[in-house]
A protein has these predicted regions:
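Catalytic alpha/beta core domains of metabolic enzymes, predominantly
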Residues: 19, 30-144
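C-terminal alpha-helical cap/extension of soluble enzyme domains
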Residues: 97, 105, 109-203
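Active-site beta->alpha loop and helix N-cap motifs at the rims of alpha/beta catalytic domains
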Residues: 1-36, 170-171
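Short, solvent-exposed amphipathic alpha-helices that sit
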Residues: 11-12, 41, 150
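Helix-coil boundary/capping segments in enzymes
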Residues: 1-2, 77-81, 150-153, 170
Length: 203
């Protein structure tokens, strides 16, 4: 978002909502770029179009309190998606999100974590979420450049991408020591997922 009045922000999303039949996800990516979208704008959109048409992906800091504020200001109507790479998935789930939009590099971990949250398995929740959070913390140290560098590194490691090359310009390169820590955390996550699969078997 930019430093626009609430009325202009609402008008922008209204134009999109009127032009398409699909639901819209209003993403506040001000954790990376721009300024936060005011909660007043979000509430006006949900008042006008309802929760089936307008969903939200709040990423303005502090994410948890902002998520709760949107939930409360909309009287629980706002359908909210988590989008912090899994870093805040546990906290966000407990605040009432309806889903998450993960990156592909840790998708198996995010899915397993979501299932653990649904079944309220506290041991599995933290066994899985802690290595995810530690990996994302390493990504965050260099902002969007860090996210992309570690994401592509892991996608190559998993055999999904052939190259970790990124379009330039970018301001950060993944150094060998950070890569080694990512490897250690990724291995810990894989062990947690194997343990979780065994724990979910019947009998």
């Amino acid at each position: 978002a930019t430093a626009l009045p609430v009325a202009e922000i609402v008008a922008y999303y209204q134009a999109l909502a009127e032009a398409v039949s699909l639901p819209l996800i209003v993403q506040d990516a001000s954790g990376y770029v721009g300024r936060p979208i005011p909660i007043d704008a979000c509430v006006q959109l949900i008042d006008r179009y309802g929760p089936e048409k307008i969903l939200f992906k709040p990423e303005s800091a502090p994410i948890g309190p902002n998520l709760s504020a949107l939930r409360d200001r909309s009287a629980g109507r706002a359908r909210i998606l988590e989008g912090s790479g899994g870093l805040l998935l546990v906290d966000s789930y407990r605040r009432g999100i309806v889903g998450t939009m993960p990156g592909m590099e840790l998708l198996d971990g995010i899915v397993a974590l979501w299932h653990a949250l649904q079944r309220r398995d506290e041991e599995a929740i933290y066994r899985i979420s802690l290595p995810i959070s530690a990996i994302v913390a390493l990504q965050m140290q260099a902002g969007l450049d860090g996210f992309l560098a570690v994401e592509k590194y892991l996608l190559v490691k998993r055999g999904i991408f052939a190259s970790a090359a990124r379009r330039r310009p970018h301001a950060w390169e993944l150094d060998p020591e950070t890569a080694a820590e990512v490897d250690r955390l990724f291995e810990r996550l894989q062990r947690a997922l194997t343990s979780d699969e065994r724990g979910c078997l019947p009998g």
